[in-house]
Amino acid sequence: MKQTLDQIFKLQDNHTTIKKEFLAGFTTFITMAYIIFVNPQIMALSGMDQGAIFVGTCLAAAIACFVMGFFANWPIGLAPGMGLNAFFTYTVVGEMGYSWEVALGAVFLAGVLFFIMSITRLRAWMISSIPLNLRIAMGAGVGLFIGLIGLKNGGIIVGNQATLLSLGEFSQIETLLAAIGFLIISILSVRKVTGAIIIGILITTLIAYFVGLIEFNGIVSYPPEIAPTFMKLDILGALNLGMLTIIMSFLFVNLFDTTGTLLGVATRANLISNDEKSDGLNKALKADSSASIFGTFFGCSPVTSYVESSAGVEAGGRTGLTSIVVGLLFLFAMFLSPLASIIPPYATAGALIYVAILMLSGMEKLNWSSTAELLPALVIIVMIPLTFSIADGIALGFLTYVFLKIFNGEFRDIASGAWFLTLIFISKFIFL
């Protein structure tokens, strides 16, 4: 067994051991396991069966981790991503009125485009076409979007006709528990406790049980049926001009988030220099992009690489065996459906708020000295949550960037890819 694993994952060449890889895999899983509770709650609001999404989340994550482990041999955990699942539910289905089947079709098409870009030079062309400030802003804007949803789900922020928004009533036990959950996660994170997010969710749920807000239905059972969402995507329905900016939004956020995550985690593991020309990176991108494609078969929003994988790297993970362990743990998690079904939205609200704050950390890399690039970035960051749409926020910020460049006499600095995207975004606001 040891010799076989060494041959497959090159353990000795990467100066690691089976024990280290298993520990790293467990560490990575614990830090990202919150997604098996949060994702079904968010996606179910689009009309999908929550039990089926729970199983789909576990299966999509497991298969994605297996592909990453065996094909790329990198210690990366993958699962349906935060942010795009909210965009899927609240914007594409909730606001724009598309069915969740058509929305899954859009995710599939975005995944196909991502895969094509990963096996050609289109990825480098697209990344170079969009300034770094705007790429950073997309992540931060999505973070605020997630944060607003978390605050809303927890009752911490409520609607107000006079002031648009106002602070919720902390006399409501659900609102108080949401705030307590966030504080628990924050305290554990400050104290560097592994799995702070999932621990916070479980403690908040436990408190809710003791105060009589929820009923205990057990922890372990056979997985629910996946049939209600399995292979239900409507690709033909997504092939219309109205879905173009939605598909591009899924693509952009996934592309930039994945590239940044893979570069950051791999550099930390000494698997790559901080560039984008590594064979290992190319394989990892192919694995990630293919995961977004087959994830739709299980009813999932885009599957992506998790920055939480860095926790596993810190624990010693250096090869794909770490990813395989993460995938196996996701398979075992399918039997925890009774636990997942009783976790209330206010118990996961604190997790959403905390993840949102983490996503804002990239703003430190913004170029604050260039007004022409800073203003469009801030437009994206502000408008994504205020329009409740990742697509609209990106479009408004990008058009602001192009117009500022044109009227500042710097239109020659606008890349060809940027002109192409400008036409798409202008068409969206005029014709769609």
Positions of the model-derived regions?
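Helix-loop-helix hairpins and the membrane-proximal interhelical loops
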Residues: 1-52, 165-167, 199-282, 423-427
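Membrane-embedded alpha-helical modules
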Residues: 96-210, 214, 324-432
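Helix-loop-helix junctions within the multi-pass membrane cores of secondary transporters/permeases
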Residues: 2-39, 60, 80-139, 267-363
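Conserved, well-structured core segments that form the ligand-binding/active-site neighborhood
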Residues: 75, 205, 209, 316
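Residue-level signature of catalytic and energy-coupling elements of molecular machines
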Residues: 22, 42, 126, 195, ...
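Transmembrane alpha-helix interface/packing and boundary motifs in multi-pass membrane proteins
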Residues: 64-77, 186-192, 250-257, 288-298, ...
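Helix-coil boundary and interhelical linker segments in multi-pass alpha-helical membrane proteins
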Residues: 41-53, 91-102, 241-244, 344, ...
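Loop-to-helix transition at the N-terminal end of transmembrane alpha-helices
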Residues: 47-66
